[in-house]
């Protein structure tokens, strides 16, 4: 088995897994590794226990928080950890706009947090996003969890002409297929911060209300995708997950 390559960057994680393959497949996989990009919602870099441990604390100019994060610590020990990666706009929507497009907020179309009173803030439809790039490179692309990069419109797939939530301004949003920028598998929502009572729209626009803590539920969905339960991805292709 080729050793997986893990990249841990502050509050985000990039995981490139190669796995067990025949020689020809291994060569192809080395050129197109499977990639899992994990990023939480505005996670504080200092709030990871390994920054207080030997081999890490002397690499940064801050003191890590006194937190207990054994799983992240173990992951860091198996990873390449970048000590100086940062966002120049660490705000929900603008950061996601930059992450997806590689552009500053004044160019990505997302200068502000997206809600129904801010039509000026929505991910540019003509932008080439990271999902577009990986899709064109032959990847099966999947997006899980919060997006919060679209201007909410009355496009509820189950109730045409209505927003997906009643409160105003509307913050949550449904992202139709034509705005998913290369992600062919979808299990996402706009923004809805009731993490013990989450909801999601799948690839076909069906809403799911799992009644489960969102990090646990989303992890389970990612694992299901990796196992290819229900034949949801093309196993002949490498995968890219966000």
Regions found by a protein language model. Name each.
Residues 3-4, 11-12, 20-242:
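Formylglycine-dependent sulfatase
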């Amino acid at each position: 088995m080729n050793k997986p390559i893990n990249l841990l960057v502050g509050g985000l994680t990039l995981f490139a897994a190669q796995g067990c393959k025949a020689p020809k497949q291994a060569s192809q996989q080395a050129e197109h590794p499977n990639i899992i990009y994990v990023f939480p919602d505005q996670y504080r870099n200092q709030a990871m226990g390994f920054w207080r441990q030997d081999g890490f604390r002397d690499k940064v100019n801050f003191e890590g928080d006194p937190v207990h994060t054994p799983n992240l610590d173990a992951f860091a020990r198996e990873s390449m950890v970048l000590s100086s990666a940062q966002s120049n706009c660490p705000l929900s929507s603008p950061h996601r706009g930059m992450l997806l497009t590689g552009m500053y907020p004044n160019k990505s179309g997302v200068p502000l947090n997206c809600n129904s009173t801010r039509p000026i803030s929505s991910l540019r439809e003509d932008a080439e996003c990271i999902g577009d790039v990986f899709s064109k490179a032959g990847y099966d692309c999947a997006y899980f969890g919060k997006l919060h990069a679209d201007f909410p419109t009355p496009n509820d797939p189950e109730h045409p002409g209505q927003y997906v939530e009643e409160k105003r301004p509307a913050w949550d949003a449904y992202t139709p297929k034509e705005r998913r920028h290369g992600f062919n598998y979808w299990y996402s929502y706009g923004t809805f911060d009731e993490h013990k009572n989450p909801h999601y729209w799948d690839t076909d626009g069906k809403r799911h209300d799992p009644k489960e803590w969102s990090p646990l539920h989303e992890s389970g969905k990612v694992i299901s995708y990796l196992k290819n339960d229900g034949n949801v991805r093309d196993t002949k292709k490498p995968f890219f997950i966000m």
